[in-house]
């Protein structure tokens, strides 16, 4: 990725009230985006958001900027990120904009864009928007100003889209499911999708108040879901993150099922049904157990850089239709254009219903290697800790000790000043010790 001033790996993100997530910046961003994107004739932009309290302020600022550039805004209200991608396509809009910081706490927020075809904006377009932001705002003539309106049936449209990805001949009537919506954008979508497909649904994390998004609930913290699945004796649990582009599951025994395992289940089922084309794309963080399990099935596997945009790029490069991150981003190009937690979860449920198998049994063909991840915060602008000789030396020692039976991955977060230290191998105690040894070296820099 080229050096850009504002856009990171997943749009623009930060703490609300601090640059760049301020009303004046977002207004100018809306204007600059309008200038760059107003080229296809519809002059409409879809704007969706998650349930953060700051979404009201930021959508108003975006709308003002777009209107000044002559584009009209169509508001969806709280809506999952993949729903905005879908609605952008179906409305033939110039673009879709999502106001969300995904799995981050409520005091963060962000802006990300979708192209007219429902895919994330290419780097070149983001760079063009940044270049436009260096100019002074100019307002179009009064008669050409944009308008604002709401899509009153946005939720219903997306619910029907999700249900259409589930086979007509199957039902969820035999399943008791706990669904955790992270007090986020899926709160009024996912429970209804599952109920309408016949499931007995117990909903948690479905009472957003503007400040409780991702707070001890959702895909990034499944403890509440695990406890509820066990207490209710449910068949499984499904957790989404704040904006609904991630899914993590829990089996009837309370075991966490991550994005690697979800992709394994979907890929294997696609192979069984004769629908899998090509291979599967993971990331540098994908578990070695996934790679080995797919190879045993004869399914090619390749790793992309971390980030769902890079998974998608690799999928397009290979002509493959399935990719995922272990964090729960699952991209199924035969179904949609971006990571969609609800759609991915439905494909796992279809495999359960079709084969009359539990989630636990569907995972049994894949042995997960212990994988320890330690996040180390560093001071932005103080140099690259990964280039320090002491960090390189400790990393080399660990890699030599693991040999071919494990891996080490050090990388910077694309959205926060964090170094992510990942060590993977056969022995959990050993990889834990190795991960903390490297993390200590990073902290000491």
From Swiss-Prot:
CDD domains: GlmM. GO terms for biological process: carbohydrate metabolic process; peptidoglycan biosynthetic process; UDP-N-acetylglucosamine biosynthetic process. It is an enzyme of class 5 (isomerase). GO terms for molecular function: magnesium ion binding; phosphoglucosamine mutase activity; phosphomannomutase activity. Activated by phosphorylation. Its EC number is 5.4.2.10. One of its GO terms (cellular component) is cytosol. The modification Phosphoserine is found at residue 102. Binds 1 Mg(2+) ion per subunit. It catalyses: alpha-D-glucosamine 1-phosphate = D-glucosamine 6-phosphate. Keywords: Isomerase, Magnesium, Metal-binding, Phosphoprotein. Mg(2+) binds at residues 102, 241, 243, 245. InterPro entries: A-D-PHexomutase_a/b/a-I, A-D-PHexomutase_a/b/a-I/II/III, A-D-PHexomutase_a/b/a-II, A-D-PHexomutase_a/b/a-III, A-D-PHexomutase_C, A-D-PHexomutase_C_sf, A-D-PHexomutase_CS, Alpha-D-phosphohexomutase_SF. Catalyzes the conversion of glucosamine-6-phosphate to glucosamine-1-phosphate. Belongs to the phosphohexose mutase family. HAMAP family: GlmM_B. This is Phosphoglucosamine mutase. It comes from Escherichia coli O81 (strain ED1a). The gene is glmM.
